[in-house]
Structure formats: structure tokens, C-alpha cells
Regions:
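RNA substrate-binding interface of SAM-dependent RNA methyltransferases
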Residues: 2-61
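Short glycine-/acidic-enriched loop or helix-start segments at secondary-structure transitions
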Residues: 11-12, 71-72, 105-108
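Short glycine/serine/threonine-biased micro-segments
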Residues: 33, 96-100, 122, 132
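Short beta-strand/loop segments at the ligand-binding rim of alpha/beta enzyme cores
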Residues: 36-39, 90-94
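A mid-sequence, solvent-exposed acidic-amphipathic segment
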Residues: 44-87, 93-96
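Short Gly/Pro-enriched loop/turn and capping motifs at secondary-structure junctions
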Residues: 66-68, 100-104, 127-128
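A C-terminal functional module that forms or caps the active site or interfaces directly
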Residues: 92-112
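Structured adenosyl-cofactor binding patch, chiefly the S-adenosyl-L-methionine
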Residues: 105-147
């Protein structure tokens, strides 16, 4: 899990080790509670353009100006018509959610250019709040990949 910031972020990053430890502890406890086989790791805050997505099978960036590709379509294209592997199968998927003001078009273009596995996706007709978009996207992924 990358904690990134971009041009339109209202809150600027704080490099506090205690927060990083807390976030990793929360991720571990949540994974244990939900019966996940793999525990997500939370990394330090970094600029979106500095994030390295090379180790991921797919990278989906939720972009409010994406009009053609939904998350479902991008998943099918990335992993075939059959549903992708479940947690046990080991697909590594990165999701990128924008800040309160949305992404700058150049930020989206940079991620798509620098990450071969990246795809810009729509989460629907409505623009969601940052905190809602992340949960909505994770719920969509769970539904599509885990049935």
C-alpha cells in the first residue's frame, strides 16, 4: 500500500515513523480479522510520480475523466474473461485513488506512461469522495475476483 500525494492534495505528507508503524499494525489486524492470507504492507508517503508499480500484475487508477473503461472491463482485460485469481492465487493489484481535488491530467498520463500494467478506470457516473472511492474500489475488486 503506497501512501502518495499529488499536486491537488490538501494535506501534505508527514514523515512520521510512528504513523507508518500504526498503519501497518492496523493492516495486520484487519487482515487477521477478515481471514486474509496475505497482509498488505503500508509504505512511506511519497510523491505519486515516485511510486514504483513495477511489481504489480495490474495497476488501476481511478480517474474521474475516464469515460471508456470501467474497473470491471479493465479487470477482464488484465486477467481474462474468467474471474481473476483469488487471494490464494496471488494477483498483485495496485489501486490509485486521487486526492480531494482529483488528479491533474499530467499525473494520470505519467502513471500510465511509466507503468506498463497501469490502466485508467471509471468507478461510475458519480464522483466519489476520496475516502469513499477507496472502499468502493476495494469492494468492486473483491466482488469481481472472489465472487
Amino acid at each position: 500500500l503506497f501512501r502518495s500525494y499529488s499536486k491537488r492534495c490538501v494535506v501534505k505528507p508527514e514523515a512520521k515513523e510512528s504513523k507508518l508503524l500504526r498503519f501497518n499494525r492496523v493492516a495486520q489486524e484487519a487482515a487477521k480479522q477478515s481471514g486474509r492470507g496475505r497482509i498488505p504492507k503500508v509504505g512511506p508517503v511519497q510523491n505519486l510520480n515516485e511510486c514504483d508499480f513495477s511489481g504489480f500484475d495490474a495497476v488501476f487508477i481511478a480517474y474521474e475523466d475516464e469515460e471508456k473503461t470501467t474497473l470491471k472491463q479493465a479487470l477482464r482485460k488484465a486477467f481474462g474473461e474468467e474471474k481473476g485469481k483469488s487471494d490464494e492465487g496471488g494477483n498483485d493489484i495496485a489501486i490509485i485513488i486521487g486526492p480531494e481535488g482529483g488528479f491533474e491530467p499530467t499525473e494520470v498520463e505519467s502513471v500510465l506512461k511509466n507503468s506498463p500494467a497501469a490502466k485508467s478506470v471509471s468507478l461510475g457516473k458519480r464522483i466519489l469522495r476520496t475516502e469513499t472511492a477507496g472502499m468502493a474500489m476495494l469492494a468492486m475488486l473483491m466482488y469481481e475476483l472472489e465472487g
